[in-house]
C-alpha cells in the first residue's frame, strides 16, 4: 500500500508541509508555548468532533487558573474537552525536545492506549455515563461497544486479534509513517477496542505517532480540525477503510494526509500568533 502512487504523493505532501513548519521562526525559542497552545486547540477541535462545543478562551482560562483538577466539574462539555486536553498534554510530555537532546521514555503500546483512554473517558466515568471498570480497559469476550462506527465492531477472538494487530503496528520498528498513523486511527474507529472514546484516542495516536516517527516533530499540528470541519468526509473515509478493499484503505490514507495538512496550516497560524505575542487570543 505504501507504494501506491496516491499514498506516495500524499506522504510527500505531508513531509514537505511539516518540513516548512519545523523551521518556522516562532519555534526556535517558543516551541514549548506552541505545543501547549496546540494541545488546547487540539482538545477544542476534538471535542467538537465528539459534540462537545467549548470556546478555546474558556479552556485556556480553566487551564491558566488551575481549575481542572477534578474529572467532573458539572459541565459535561467542559469535562469532555478537559479530558482531551489532559491526554494532549500527556502526549506533549512524551515528545522529544525540539531544541536540545531531551527525549522522554514512551510507555509500551498497551500502556499508552490505557493512559490516553483514562484521560479521555475518565470524565464520563466520573459523571456515571460509563462504568469505572471500562476506563483504560479494552473490551473482551462479548462486551459490546457503546459507540457506533464504520462496519460491525468485532467481538471475542476477532476483537482480540484486531487489538493485538493494533499493538504490533504501533510498536513495529519499521513502518511507513503516514500509513502507520492512518491505519492505527482507522483501527480505533472500526475495531473499537474500548467501549467508548475510540475515535478521540485514535486521533491522539495520530499526533503521537507522527511526532515519534519524525514526520511532524514540532507537535503543533492540529489534526483534529479537519474531521470537525468536514464530518461527512471523515465518516465517508472511515467507511471506505472498513470496506476492506485496497481502494478503500488508500482513500482513508489520503484522507488522513489531508487532515494532517489542515493541521499544519493551523500550526502555522498558531506560530504567527505566538511570534506576535497574541497567541492567547488565537
Predicted regions and their residues:
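FIC/Doc superfamily catalytic core
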Residues: 1-282
Amino acid at each position: 500500500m505504501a507504494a501506491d502512487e496516491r499514498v506516495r504523493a500524499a506522504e510527500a505532501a505531508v513531509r514537505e508541509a511539516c518540513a516548512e513548519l519545523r523551521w518556522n521562526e516562532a519555534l526556535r525559542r517558543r516551541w514549548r508555548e506552541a505545543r501547549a497552545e496546540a494541545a488546547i486547540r487540539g482538545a477544542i477541535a476534538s471535542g467538537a468532533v465528539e459534540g462537545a462545543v467549548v470556546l478555546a478562551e474558556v479552556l485556556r482560562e480553566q487551564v491558566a487558573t488551575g481549575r481542572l483538577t477534578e474529572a467532573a466539574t458539572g459541565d459535561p462539555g467542559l469535562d469532555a474537552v478537559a479530558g482531551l486536553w489532559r491526554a494532549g498534554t500527556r502526549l506533549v510530555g512524551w515528545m522529544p525536545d525540539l531544541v536540545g537532546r531531551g527525549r522522554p521514555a514512551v510507555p509500551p503500546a498497551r500502556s499508552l492506549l490505557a493512559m490516553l483512554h483514562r484521560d479521555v473517558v475518565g470524565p464520563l466515568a466520573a459523571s456515571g455515563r460509563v462504568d469505572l471498570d471500562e476506563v483504560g480497559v479494552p473490551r473482551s469476550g462479548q462486551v459490546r461497544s457503546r459507540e457506533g462506527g464504520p462496519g460491525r465492531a468485532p467481538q471475542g477472538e476477532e476483537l482480540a486479534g484486531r487489538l493485538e494487530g493494533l499493538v504490533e503496528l504501533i510498536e513495529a520498528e519499521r513502518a511507513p509513517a503516514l500509513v502507520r498513523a492512518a491505519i492505527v486511527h482507522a483501527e480505533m474507529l472500526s475495531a473499537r477496542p474500548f467501549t467508548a472514546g475510540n475515535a478521540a484516542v485514535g486521533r491522539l495516536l495520530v499526533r503521537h505517532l507522527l511526532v515519534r516517527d519524525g514526520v511532524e516533530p514540532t507537535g503543533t499540528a492540529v489534526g483534529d480540525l479537519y474531521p470537525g470541519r468536514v464530518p461527512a468526509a471523515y465518516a465517508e473515509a472511515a467507511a471506505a477503510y472498513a470496506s476492506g478493499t485496497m481502494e478503500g484503505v488508500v482513500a482513508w490514507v489520503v484522507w488522513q494526509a489531508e487532515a494532517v495538512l489542515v493541521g499544519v496550516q493551523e500550526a502555522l497560524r498558531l506560530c504567527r500568533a505566538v511570534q506576535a505575542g497574541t497567541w492567547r487570543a488565537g
